[in-house]
A protein has these predicted regions:
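Short, Lys/Arg-enriched N-terminal segments with co-localized hydrophobic residues
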Residues: 1-16
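Acidic (E/D-rich), amphipathic helical modules within compact regulatory domains
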Residues: 48-78
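Short, charged, amphipathic alpha-helical segments
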Residues: 25, 51-59, 83, 87, ...
Length: 158
């Protein structure tokens, strides 16, 4: 009986550990998507209030990536996944294409809301995964709540 419990704990523990790594990887990629997009649009912004909001959001993404890095080290000796060069190029191209005729604050806020909504959806899907450690769950909640808060702030600029 003890052997069965050991085997079950070993298998289940491995599943949870892999889930934690996968969830942290997805959160990190989501943060870097936000960082990459904000790096691009910040160059287009002159309005001081809008710029300050985006800089604050950028900083929160950076803080989250630092927390992800720290927690990731408890599960793996590798680095968490970031966005690929191809995805960065596609992000840059998409923003340039969508703002070539209209680079107003309203248009950029709209683009950022749409991108942030994708992050919220991914965060909510990850939260529905019940097999994660409490610290990973908290980080996932913080990621999702941060994005939900910024959507509300971005709406003022539509």
């Amino acid at each position: 009986m003890n052997n069965l419990i050991f085997i079950w704990n070993t298998i289940y523990g491995g599943i949870v550990m892999n889930n934690n790594i996968n969830i942290l990887d997805e959160l990190n990629k989501g943060c870097y998507m936000g960082i990459d997009a904000l790096d691009i649009v910040l160059k287009k912004i002159e309005d001081p209030d809008f710029k300050e909001l985006l800089e604050d959001q950028h900083e929160e993404y950076v803080e989250l990536t630092n927390r992800i890095d720290e927690l990731y080290r408890t599960y793996s000796d590798k680095e968490p996944h970031e966005t690929s060069a191809m995805l960065k190029a596609m992000t840059w191209y998409g923003i340039q294409k969508d703002t070539i005729l209209d680079d107003s604050i309203s248009k950029i806020a709209d683009l950022l809301i749409n991108g942030t909504n994708m992050g919220i959806i991914e965060g909510r899907k990850l939260l529905n995964n019940k097999k994660m450690d409490k610290k990973v769950h908290k980080l996932c909640c913080d990621y999702t709540k941060m994005q939900e808060n910024y959507i509300e702030k971005l709406k003022k600029f539509l």
